[in-house]
Amino acid sequence: NEEKFEISKKAVEDIEKGGSKEAFAKSDHPMLKGWSYRDMWWMTENAHGAFTARGVYGQTIYIDPKAAMVIVRLASHPVAANSANDAYSLPAYQAVADYLKTKK
């Protein structure tokens, strides 16, 4: 017996609005310049409208609407901070999205 979980279109639209880039710019996230935060989602504010849920040890759900891509990263990084892996994780997610966009 499979259960289905659906997120309402209204909830997704609310998340996609993003948060205040001005407020976020005052935070301590140097790798995330130009981003915002809304409803527990980190908004890249990139051309693809990508957004991500981030766990403290590198767990990630990365959604890129333009590339029709969802990446789920299960992780247990020894450092309890995403800044420990952002330098390679974030460019990797973008590279996969860029590649997928070339295949459409």
Which ranges hold each PLM region?
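Structured C-terminal helix/loop/strand segments within mature extracytoplasmic catalytic/sensor domains
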Residues: 50-104
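Active-site Gly/Thr loop motif
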Residues: 1-6, 10-70
